[in-house]
Structures are given as C-alpha cells and as structure tokens.
Amino acid sequence: MRKETPPPLVPPAAREWNLPPNAPACMERQLEAARYRSDGALLLGASSLSGRCWAGSLWLFKDPCAAPNEGFCSAGVQTEAGVADLTWVGERGILVASDSGAVELWELDENETLIVSKFCKYEHDDIVSTVSVLSSGTQAVSGSKDICIKVWDLAQQVVLSSYRAHAAQVTCVAASPHKDSVFLSCSEDNRILLWDTRCPKPASQIGCSAPGYLPTSLAWHPQQSEVFVFGDENGTVSLVDTKSTSCVLSSAVHSQCVTGLVFSPHSVPFLASLSEDCSLAVLDSSLSELFRSQAHRDFVRDATWSPLNHSLLTTVGWDHQVVHHVVPTEPLPAPGPASVTE
C-alpha cells in the first residue's frame, strides 16, 4: 500500500478572473458530483445543505486545476435545488438528479459558456438520489427516495417505464456499459436487483449483500460484462459475478459507509472507493489496497478518472475540496534490500 504522493507542481498558465454569463457568483459548499469529459474538462455539481434553502449549481472547468474557483470556470448555472448526482450525456448534455424530485437535462451551448435547460421533469415524489445513462446514450435510469425507478427516453423527454420493485428508498442505479437494456439498482431494503428491460419481469435479485448491512454503491466492471462491485454501509467492498450471483471477493476497505465506487480506464482497471470515513482508497483486481488518501476533511462524495492521464484521479467532498491524486500505476517494489532508496 502506498500513501498519497502530491502531484508535481507545474506553474499554471496565467489565468484571468472572468465569470461567464449566467454563472452564479458563489459555489455552494458541499461538492456532490464530479465527471471528466473525454477532452479532460471537469464538470462539478454542488449543493448547499444548510440554511432555509437547499440550493445547487453546475460548473464546467476547462482547466480542472482551477476548480473549485468560480472565477475560472468556463460555464456555470444555478439549479432549483441541490444536485444529488449527475452524468454526461454525450459531449454537451448533462443529466442531473435533483433534491427537488426532478430529473433535469441541461446542455452546453456551442461556445460552452452557457448551460441551458432542456427539460425538468417532476416524475418522482421525493429526492432523486441517482441517475445513470444506458449504453445506447438515448435512455437513462433514475432512482429516488420515493422507492421508484424510472427509465427515461431523453430525446422524447418522457418516462418509458416506472418500477416499484424495491421496498425502501433507492440509493444507487448503474447502467451496464456492455448491454443497453441492463442496469443494477440497490436500496435500503438490503437488496441488489439486476434489471433487463427486455424481459416481461425485468428485475431479478442478486443475493449477495451481507445481512444487516445495506448496499450503498454500485459499479460495473468496464471489461467483464457479468461482473460488478458494490459497497455497503459498513465500509465493505465486494466483487460479484452475476452468473453465479455470489460474491467472488470481499474486503473491509473503510470504517464507515461507502459513498462511491469508480473503475479506472486502465487495461487492468483499478477501483476507486470513497467513504464517509473521509478517505479514498484505490484497489487492484484482487481488492487489495494500492493507495489511500485522507486529504478530505469531510465525506468524500465522488471521484472521476482523467481520460488524458490515467494516473490522475480527482475527488470531491463536502469539505469543498477538489483533490487531484496521482495514483501509482506500476507494481509496488518487493520488500527487501533492493527496494531501499536513499
């Protein structure tokens, strides 16, 4: 296991404070979500979880190192309520799960200085906690504290299907990157469901969660179409094969609830695991720890791997920090005299 190595300090190009039109003057404190785009631009979702109004906002940074400084963003917009989750739809679309109960689709204009609302649909009756775009790119899935899961047609701006297969609030949905009709969901009813919308009975239960410990996070393996990972409220991360519906591996990674799991784009992918214990852990294919950071001072809420530098992992949290981690990609040296350095 290797501790965090600070990224090399490269003198940044001279930046000019230039708040774009319609961008809020101030970003909310709690950073909930982060996603890199394929060109390396960084999208942030922020929420204010104190006071009488739960506000939120979206921010695009062409220079991720400038985040979360509002004056150096490329585009920004105020949202009606807090941002619980977000994801890219193509290169310019932004799908948002809102604390208001809405699923929102925003779009960058051609100059990428404005974020414009395409639709805002109140189909859920409580906070929308999670969204995921199906691999086709034309449909999406949302999960809510109202117990419902909904499948959306993004172009038609309508709900195609609504499901109440869970018995408690939905904590995470994850679309398969391999099959455009398949996704996972987990809930506070202590169940993980595997969905295939082509089937008359689309949901089947994966019986792998530990009794008494609620699953909180899901992520599909990017290369193995039948394999996924999940994290639970106890801090454990487990690897599951859907063919056998059993846990292949399990590891106690954190001391508190797992808040997110994100695979890297490596040929043999790493897994970033985030937690309410304020730490980030990076795991290898056997769920052994390669790297750990405790740079955050509050819950770590999201992570995203840079598409341009596969060693760079960016995390955000409720402490308003955007932390860029350099993760070692080479095998660790074996212990012994040969590994001693001056």
UniProtKB/Swiss-Prot annotation:
Cross-referenced InterPro entries: Methylosome_Comp_WDR77 (IPR052139), WD40/YVTN_repeat-like_dom_sf (IPR015943), WD40_repeat_CS (IPR019775), WD40_repeat_dom_sf (IPR036322), WD40_rpt (IPR001680)
Record PTM Phosphothreonine, positions in chain: T5
Tagged with keyword Transmembrane: no
Tissues expressed in: Highly expressed in heart, skeletal muscle, spleen, testis, uterus, prostate and thymus. In testis, expressed in germ cells and Leydig cells, but not in peritubular myocytes, nor in Sertoli cells. Expressed in prostate cancers, in seminomas and in Leydig cell tumors.
Keyword rRNA processing: no
Listed GO CC annotations: Cul4B-RING E3 ubiquitin ligase complex; cytoplasm; cytosol; Golgi apparatus; methylosome; nucleoplasm; nucleus
Function, in words: Non-catalytic component of the methylosome complex, composed of PRMT5, WDR77 and CLNS1A, which modifies specific arginines to dimethylarginines in several spliceosomal Sm proteins and histones. This modification targets Sm proteins to the survival of motor neurons (SMN) complex for assembly into small nuclear ribonucleoprotein core particles. Might play a role in transcription regulation.
The name this protein goes by in its record: Methylosome protein WDR77
Naturally occurring in which organism (per UniProt): Homo sapiens (Human)
